[in-house]
Amino acid sequence: MKHIVLLGDSIFDNRSYVNPNELDVPNQLRSLVGRDFKVTNLAVDGHVTRHIHNQLNNLPSDATHLFISVGGNDGLGHLSIFNQPIETIGEALQKMYLIGEKFKKVYSSMLDNVLTHDLPTSVCNIYYPRFYSNSLDRVYSYLRMGVNVVKLQQMAMAAETIFNDIIMFEVFKRNLPLIDLRIL
């Protein structure tokens, strides 16, 4: 029997984000793969890239395939930069570059750690945020009151490209398959 293991954040641990009559991602996957596959969800809502190491500590010994979706919460952790004063666009780009460099080190290390398990591994990038259609409760602590949701959406999508570029570079550098969540 094949055994799929999901690692990451709320992309896979999304029970609290779906309606009671809807299937979460692990159960959708179970319904698609049938009885020939076992599905284990080690993903945890709120986790960031550095938490994957802890999730791997619980990797079942019979795991045959890994799927990773992480990085969005790493980006959310930097939303406060949107409120920092800057003098030039160049200065803003440099700040984003430095955030990206830190993320790249953590993400690259995480992938190397995952690959030590010698299992077929597929990776998801970060989907576009949808602040305009969801509650802003998760992000209010990062932003000043009275935020314009349209501007927040635009800024987050622009900043997200840095994280997704790093994810895609690190994934393709290792010849791993990528699932682009932006088009789903």
Map each language-model feature to its residues.
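Short amphipathic alpha-helices and their capping/turn segments at secondary-structure boundaries
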Residues: M1, R50-L66, V106-D118, F169
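Serine-esterase "nucleophile elbow" of acetyl-processing enzymes
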Residues: M1-D45, N57-D62
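Structural beta-sheet core signal
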Residues: L6, I68, V123-N125
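Helix C-cap/helix->beta junction micro-motif
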Residues: V33, H117, K173-R174
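Substrate-gating cap/lid alpha-helix
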Residues: F131-I179
